[in-house]
């Protein structure tokens, strides 16, 4: 059984978020939370919040035991880009792309659910 949580349009570049997601992918939920608390990156608190939401979804919606859960999937996709301009010399301007992320975390207890035909 799986439970999932998504945070959309987070104002951190996906490349930076993926660095932290790589640390928790495949880990036990408790271990992943401990790693996030000690990781000194801007995306850590946001990812921790999404992970806690996924755990709460698992417990509330599917009656799963949160102690047995493992981070099955953790990925960051690119969200909408905010385009800004920086004035440069001689009347020119250069583009600044402020990138956003969609963060998705899926937790699983390792048990397969019965599929209906």
Curated annotation (Swiss-Prot):
Protein name: Large ribosomal subunit protein uL22
Biological source species: Staphylococcus epidermidis (strain ATCC 35984 / DSM 28319 / BCRC 17069 / CCUG 31568 / BM 3577 / RP62A)
Gene Ontology terms for molecular function: rRNA binding; structural constituent of ribosome
GO cellular component, as recorded: cytosolic large ribosomal subunit
Annotated function: This protein binds specifically to 23S rRNA; its binding is stimulated by other ribosomal proteins, e.g. L4, L17, and L20. It is important during the early stages of 50S assembly. It makes multiple contacts with different domains of the 23S rRNA in the assembled 50S subunit and ribosome. The globular domain of the protein is located near the polypeptide exit tunnel on the outside of the subunit, while an extended beta-hairpin is found that lines the wall of the exit tunnel in the center of the 70S ribosome.
Biological process terms in GO annotation: translation
Keywords: Ribonucleoprotein, Ribosomal protein, RNA-binding, rRNA-binding
Pfam families, A to Z: Ribosomal_L22
PROSITE patterns: RIBOSOMAL_L22 (PS00464)
Subunit structure of this chain's protein: Part of the 50S ribosomal subunit.
InterPro entries registered for this protein in UniProt: Ribosomal_uL22, Ribosomal_uL22_bac/chlpt-type, Ribosomal_uL22_bac/org-type, Ribosomal_uL22_CS, Ribosomal_uL22_sf
